[in-house]
Amino acid sequence: PTRGGKSYVNFPAINALESLGNRWQKMSRDGIHDRMKMWGLNTLAAWSSTEIRQDKKTPYTLLASIWWLTGKKTPSPFRDDYVEDLCKALENSAWAKNDPYCLGIFIGNEFEWPDHFSQLVFELPDGDTTKKWVLRQIRQKYASLDQLNAAWDASFSNWDQILQHGDTTHRASAAKDIDPLYFEFAQEFFRKSKQAIEQSLPGTLFLGCRCHRGPSVLGRAAV
């Protein structure tokens, strides 16, 4: 077989074929289901094959994700095409619609949510949709750039300068206005993700996201 454009030898499959015959795939999957029951395991792992999940013998969960434009393991829910792209990714799981063995679906894998939202915002490239959204919120709070300069003890000459990538001069002051926006950012991710699920797999339970780490604001935003 091939994977990623490269050929490889599947020695476990060769051994199973020799010992079990042409029906080795079905017999191997049956053995996995039986062993899981004997060992007290009640749910298939995230990367289990589609075939073993479609056997309808052991409950499983789904996982869907899209490439985040930032290149970071954090979502970009303010992208205009976020829901559309996620719906396309969910098409791969259309076979599980209304399957009673499907416990639900996770959106995203091993997200690394920073402790502070400002930390993420300043690391994003200039022009990123999340950064643009943050800038809009800040401009709603301050009627003029002079007011912001006074609050941040800064001397910006235009609004585009205040969140520039790599500028660390006023981050401590900026964090007081940016960090409270974390809740709305996370809430938008959960809201739009659920929207995509309801469009593509209506009735499927949204299990949230799989996280490497994350602050408590995620739990509040997910409710």
Predicted regions: what they are:
Residues 47-49, 63-67, 107-110, 209-211:
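Active-site-proximal beta-strand/loop segments in catalytic clefts of secreted hydrolases
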Residues 1, 10-18, 99-222:
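Polysaccharide-binding and catalytic clefts of secreted carbohydrate-active enzymes
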Residues 57-59, 204-205:
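Proline-centered loop/turn at the N-terminus of a beta-strand
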Residues 50-58, 219-223:
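Short loop/helix-cap segments at secondary-structure boundaries that form the rim of catalytic
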Residues 1-55, 64, 69-101, 171-172, ...:
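Active-site-adjacent substrate/metal-binding segments within catalytic domains
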Residues 58-62, 120-123:
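Short secondary-structure boundary/capping segments
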